[in-house]
Structures are given as C-alpha cells and as structure tokens.
Amino acid sequence: MDEKQQLIGSLPTTNDSFEQRAHAKKSSRWGTVKLIAACAVLVALLHWTFVVPKLPMKHGKHGKHHHQKSQCPQVEPLVPSQQTDELVNMDAYLKSPAFQNSSIQRLSGAVQIDTQSFDDLGKVGDDKRWEVFYPFHEYLEKTFPLVYEHLKVEKVNTHGLVYTWQGSDAKLKPTLLMAHQDTVPVPDATLDAWTHPPWSGFFDGKEIWGRGSSDCKNQLIAILESVELLLDAGFVPTRTVLLSFGFDEEISGGQGAGTLAPFILERYGPDSLAVIVDEGAGISDEWGVTMATPGVAEKGYTDVVITIRMPGGHSSIPPDHTAIGVMSELITLIEADKYPLRLDGKNPYLGQLYCGAEHATEFPKKLGKLLDKAQGQCKAKPDSLAAEAAKAGPAIQYLMQTSIAVDVIGGGVKVNALPERVQAIVNHRINVGEHPADAHAKIAGLAKEVAKKYGLALHSFDNTTESPSSISLSAFEHVLEPAPVTPTSVDGETAYSVLSGSIRALYGSEVIVAPGIMTGNTDTKYYWDLSRNIFRFAPGYDGESSGLGNIHTVDERVSIKNHVNTVKWFSLFIRNMDEADFE
C-alpha cells in the first residue's frame, strides 16, 4: 500500500565485500561519501517535512487558516455553512438539561446490558456466550427508532452491525464512524471493589459508572445519538454515512471487525471511504496547553510462543535445570535485552513534539533544543531526543520503543514430577520503523544461545512440530506491521483539516490539534484497505475529569459532560464532512 511507504528512504549501505583488493580503499572512501550524502538528504527531508510550513488552506465556506510559518499549523474552527431552523434548534437542544438527562438514560441503559467478551470464546453460533448481544441489539433498536426507520441496518456474522445512511451524491466517498459493542470482562474477585456495581449504569450526578461506560459504549451510543438528532432535525446527507460496530474488539476483533471490514470492502472497493473515525486517543492537558491528539497510526503487533520440551522424571533426581528453569533463563535474557529507543522520522509523535515546542508554554527547553538538533541526526546514532522525551514516563517511552511483555506462562503438572513441557507467550508492540520479523529474529538469537548451552534442538519459526529436548518458536497467526500513517497535511481541504476544525469549533481555538500514535491496536487494523484517512479519536472532553476513565479496571466511568461533548462532536463532524469537497 502507498500509505506504508516511508517518508524517508533507507540509507544506502556500502558493500564491504570486494573481489579486488586494489579497489578496497577507494570503495571505502566512496561509501563514506555516500553515507554523508545520505545524512544530508535525511536532513533536507526532515526539514521539508516538519519545518517548511504547509500552505494555508483556502477554506472558503468552511473557515480560514493562520497565515504564518508554522511547524504545527492549526486550522480555524470549522462550522457548517448550511443551517436550518431545525439544525439551530438541535444545537440548542444539545446544550440543554433536557438532552443531558435523556442522554444519561441512554448510556446508562447500554451499560446495564452485559456484553463481555472472553479470550476463549468459540465461533459465533457455537458458543452461547455470544448471545448477550441479542438483547443489546434490541435495546439499540428501541432506543433509536429514527435510526432504525431511516438507515439500512445489516448484521454481519450475526452480531456485527453496519448502518448505511445513504447520501444523495453517490460519487462522494462515504464517512465511516466506528465503535465496538463488547467490553472486557469483570472478574468476580473484583466485584466487591467497585464503588457502584459494574452493570448498574449508576449516575452520581456527574459520572456514569460501569463496565463499558468509557470503553466504548459511550462512543457507540454517542454516534447513534448524533444520527438520531440529525434525522429528527430533518438533515439529509449529501455524503453517505456508514456506521460499523464490531463485537469482539477486546479479543482482537477477528469475528467482528474481521468480517465487517471485508463486507464493506466488497461493497465499496479499496480506498473507497473518505475518512474513518474509531475509538482512540483523546484530549488532555500537555505542557501547559490543551491538546487533542487523534491517533494517525498504530504500533505493530506480534505474539511469540516459546515451547521448551525436556525429559521428565521424578523430582527427587532432578537435573541442574528443569524445563521451567531453562524457560526462566530465556525469559530473563529476553526482558534484559530491551529494544532501543528510536523516534523514526514518520512516527507521529515527532509531529506532536513539534506542536508542543511551538504552542505549549511549558514545553521543556532541553527537549526543544534536542528537537532542533534531531533534524540532522542519522539513525545510526543514539536517539538522544527519544531518550529525553521518554523521561516523561512509560506511556510516552513506548510510543518510541518496541515493547516486550511476557504475559502468559505455564508448565508442570505435579510437584514431584519434572516438567516435560513448558510454554510462554511474549507480546510485542512494534515501533514505527521496525517490523515483527525483527522481534522474531531477536528472540531466535537469544533462544539459540540457550539451546546450545543446554544441548537442545532449536525450531525457529519453521513450522516444525515440537520434538523432545527442544526449544520451539512460533508466532500467532495475528502478526501486524505498524499501521500506515494517515496524512496530516492541511494544505487544502483534507480529512485531517476537517477533523481538526471540528475539534476547534467545539472546544475553542485554544485547543491545539497534533498527530498522535496508539501503542495498542483498534478494530481499524482490519480497515486499512478502505481509506488512507484513519483516525483513532475519542472526541469527548470534560476538562475536570482526567485520565482514561478507568478503562479495563475497577470503577470504570465517564462524566456526562464528556459524553454530551462526544455527541456534539459527532453531529458537527458529520455535517462538516458532508460539506467537504476533498473526496
């Protein structure tokens, strides 16, 4: 795919194998010249990409840009030009206590329906635990009557939902809005730790509590609320609007988004959507400024399975190291051999740093100086900019570093029997500019050392069946390269400029919009072929409630102000996209 092409090409390498000794010295000098030239090209490209300002967009009916040189240009707030009395009344209703009260009831009702997904779920149709989605679908149909009356509603693989709001101009690429219906489980052991029961949907006067309230039934309900309101106001779209709601995002999405995306692809074709918005990064206070950081990329992903087979026997006559001991040694080596911090030239976090340097009053001076120097830094050198930025904590560190986490381990069946088979699973989130194959090669190298030390055979990603006295390495089927980076140009009208303008229209021009990157993966990983404009963004913002709403843990909740703002944003974005003329 074109989106996967790097902004900056790889540096040329010199050939250190020569047939004639007489030419070695000359070739070495030429290699040095090429390396210097490559660095010069790299400097120029980085300068052009991040320093040379984008031309201001001639926005016409939608708004204007700041006419100034900028490393992080901001668009003016974007307000739809087409207004009717009904739409004006809708906007007023969105600000009213009456709407807030009804919105509380809608989200609370959705939270009260248990839609947990589990790692060991079988196929749809075989595992009855999927049936929790039937009452959820009934609730949606009852709660949003206009949506179900006017939009085409289709079910994919039984529980996946696709809504089509047909536009009047079939030549325009559709807008796709996404969310997922499922939630992570609530362990029984944690039930007593909840302030309010996880399926209560309790509203305490400020926040709605319960599993899924912030991940991400709030986004799903907000999307449907915005469409319901627009229908009630008589809005008729010119550009088709699609809604796609998966049901197993929390367990990698294979049966949900993994079937929804091909369904949409078959109907519309490759690169057929103008924009995709799914759950993701949001709005927070950074370096003394309020910053919206829609995710324009995601890290890659691979799980490596390590299996060690060694002879069993009675525990009273053990070897120096059992299979568990050998596995422990290998895991220790894996965890000790960290991946380097590297801020690749196409990593969106680099753009976020430039936005901070330009617009944030509390941006660290040392980071700013390193940011200037980074324009001339070759990849071969230690990345001092990444190292300094990583001091902000692990959440920032792993935006620029491949992560390794040994998350699953098992082996041994009895206390007096030597373990014959031990298995561990190592999760990797792959940094921008790197590849899952790099992680496979790295673990293979460490496993080779351990296998040699203990006289074990090594089967390294070769699809070989396990054998006695061996270490076997394999990868789960789900291996993902880092996502293509969504364009963030505001030169002319673009998906990014419409998204940015919608954010600033709702929250004010003091909010800075900067590109973001996700350390985790969303359902969008199945949708890459449908659009180059994919944003992972949670548009709700409170200003008083911080953090991520306790997603995936006890006391998950979302403020009603955050939720209402999510509804406001989607109703605004749908209308702004309807007037956009870039695709």
Describe these PLM feature segments:
Residues E207, G212-T293:
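Acidic/histidine-rich catalytic neighborhood of metal-dependent amide-processing enzymes
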Residues H23-K26, W30-G31, H47-R211, L230-R239:
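Acidic/His- and Gly-rich active-site-bordering loop/insert found
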Residues S108, Q112-Q116, E141, P145, ...:
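Sec-exported extracytoplasmic/periplasmic mature domains
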Residues D2-C39, V43-N89, A98, G282-T290, ...:
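Metal-dependent amide/peptide-bond hydrolase catalytic core
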Residues M178-H180, V277-E279, A538:
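Short beta-strand segments
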Residues K171-P174, P237-V241, D271-A274, S509-V511, ...:
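Loop/turn elements at helix/coil->beta-strand transitions in domains of secreted/extracellular proteins
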Residues D204-D215, A514, V554-D555:
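Short pre-catalytic strand/loop immediately N-terminal to key active-site residues, enriched for Gly-Thr
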Residues S117-F118, A170, Q181-V184, D248-S252, ...:
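Solvent-exposed loop/turn segments at secondary-structure junctions
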